[in-house]
């Protein structure tokens, strides 16, 4: 399948590359429709990451937060046109003690492994979640960062005492704002 990838080749320079994407029946092909730019993407683009990191990871398609529509699923679990969220972490092993996002063998999109700035993204079936039709796609593009906030709040719940009349969140970015919204909703 012919695919177009938009790769950052050096700070502030994105080049278009065309390649033949192998189509595996175990994968779902997703066409990204709404993407969210993370601070990590900005640091790669602006060249504010360490030069050694840039040299090691570029060229690379950016963006690890996004939703899209299914273009192809040979197994039929998803229909063409189904709205889905793409999970950027790709684990290759299971560990009873270490969460998949902390395993050294896992690959994370847009961190040394092409992200979602492509016309089509081949995703493992377990890395795709169908979205309800009622969810606004612009909001859904933030599901990955919302999951980060939710994970932090779940840990907070496990290790904090029961008195939660007042909770403070330090930070002035999207993650702090979303975490504050979720905390307010939960408590």
Predicted regions span which residues?
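Mid-domain Rossmann-like dinucleotide-binding core that forms the NAD(H)/NADP(H) cofactor-binding site
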Residues: 135-187
């Amino acid at each position: 399948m012919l695919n177009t990838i938009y790769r950052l080749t050096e700070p502030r320079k994105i080049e278009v590359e065309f390649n033949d994407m192998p189509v595996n029946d175990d994968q779902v092909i997703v066409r990204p429709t709404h993407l969210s730019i993370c601070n990590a993407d900005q640091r790669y683009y602006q060249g504010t990451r360490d030069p050694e990191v840039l040299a090691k990871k570029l060229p690379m398609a950016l963006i690890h937060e996004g939703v899209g529509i299914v273009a192809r699923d040979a197994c039929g679990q998803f229909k063409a046109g189904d709205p889905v969220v793409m999970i950027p972490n790709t684990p290759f092993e299971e560990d009873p003690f270490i969460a998949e996002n902390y395993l050294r063998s896992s690959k994370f999109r847009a961190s040394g492994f092409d992200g979602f700035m492509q016309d089509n993204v081949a995703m493992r079936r377990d890395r795709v979640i169908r979205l309800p039709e009622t969810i606004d796609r612009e909001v859904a593009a933030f599901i990955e960062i919302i999951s980060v906030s939710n994970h932090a709040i779940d840990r907070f719940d496990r290790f904090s005492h029961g008195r939660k009349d007042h909770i403070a969140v330090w930070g002035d970015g999207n993650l702090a704002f979303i975490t504050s919204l979720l905390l307010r909703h939960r408590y």
